[in-house]
Curated annotation (Swiss-Prot):
Residues 41-114 are annotated as: Disordered. It comes from Bacillus phage SP01 (Bacteriophage SP01). Residues 55-68, 78-95 have a biased composition (Basic and acidic residues). The lineage of its organism: Viruses, Duplodnaviria, Heunggongvirae, Uroviricota, Caudoviricetes. It comes from the Viruses. This is Gene 27 protein. GO terms for biological process: DNA replication. Required for late gene transcription and DNA replication. Keywords: DNA replication, Transcription, Transcription regulation.
Amino acid sequence: MSITAMDAKLQRILEESTCFGIGHDPNVKECKMCDVREQCKAKTQGMNVPTPTRKKPEDVAPAKEKPTTKKTTAKKSTAKEEKKETAPKAKETKAKPKSKPKKAKAPENPNLPNFKEMSFEELVELAKERNVEWKDYNSPNITRMRLIMALKASY
C-alpha cells in the first residue's frame, strides 16, 4: 500500500468515525487526552484499522419496557390519614430572590486629603507629621498602598 493510499484510508476512517482516536496522531490534543491512545497507535501503525460507521437510529434496538404494574401492600388507614390526604394543600410561595448585602462604606472624613494625587515623598512627610509608622516592601506600589492605609487609619 502506498503512503497516499494509507493517508486516504485514514482520512476516510476519521471522517466516518465518532471517535477522534481511531487514527492516532501524537500531536493532536484529543489523542493526548484519550484513554485508548496506545491501542489506536498500534492499530494505526499496523494499518489494521477497522472502519467504523455511525449507527443509524433504526439500527438501534429499542430498550425493553419494564412492567408498569407494581405490587401494592395493603395499608390500614385511619380517618385522620384520609383527611390529611384529601385536605387541600396550601399554596406554595416562591422564594423571593435575596439581594446581595451591600458593602459597608467607611465614613468619609472631610479632613482626609486626596492621597492619589500626592507623591510618595509627600506621603512620607505627612506620615512623619501624624506620627504614622509604615514598613518598606519590595514593591514601591505595595509600600505606597500600605502607607496610605496607615495614614487613613490615623484620621
